[in-house]
């Protein structure tokens, strides 16, 4: 394999994955689910549309996750920033950043069209997330992380983030 093929491989792979992901995302109608907290879903929708950031603590299958509730757009912008400091080949960084930019653009477009289509979010995004196991053990990170989870998996929540 030549150097040119090495550089092109990540672009081709990410291009295919991005196409598959974009197709799957546009097929998701984001309709309300029965086992979902409608208030939390509405609150996430409000954050996605307004860009508001607010502290929140979630209970997810025995795990407590706490951080700043952010819009899907802010989440993907954060992923792009994280990739800029990744310890990997520059072409791979650029491919990831472009993929995150395109995916984030799709979410932004969905949020903008939300007024007309009344779509409902199916994912929740946190910045500076910290996790606490049911045993009380904190999952240690050097700093909080970006976190994404399915709204249908959230058992409960409260406004405000843990210190």
Where are these predicted regions, by residue range?
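Conserved RNA-binding domains used in RNP assembly and mRNA/RNA metabolism
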Residues: 2-163
């Amino acid at each position: 394999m030549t150097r040119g093929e090495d550089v092109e491989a990540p672009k081709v792979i990410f291009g295919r994955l991005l196409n598959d992901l974009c197709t799957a995302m546009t097929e998701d109608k984001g309709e309300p689910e029965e086992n979902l907290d409608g208030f939390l879903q509405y609150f996430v929708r409000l954050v996605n549309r307004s860009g508001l950031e607010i502290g929140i603590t979630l209970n997810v299958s025995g795990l407590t996750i706490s951080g700043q509730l952010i819009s899907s757009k802010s989440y993907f912008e954060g992923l792009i920033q994280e990739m800029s400091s990744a310890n990997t080949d520059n072409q791979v960084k650029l491919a990831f950043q472009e993929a995150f930019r395109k995916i984030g653009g799709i979410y932004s477009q969905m949020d903008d069209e939300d007024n007309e289509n009344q779509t409902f979010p199916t994912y929740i995004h946190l910045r500076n997330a910290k996790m606490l196991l049911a045993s009380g053990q904190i999952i240690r990170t050097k700093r909080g992380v970006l976190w994404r989870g399915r709204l249908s998996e959230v058992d409960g929540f409260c406004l405000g983030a843990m210190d």
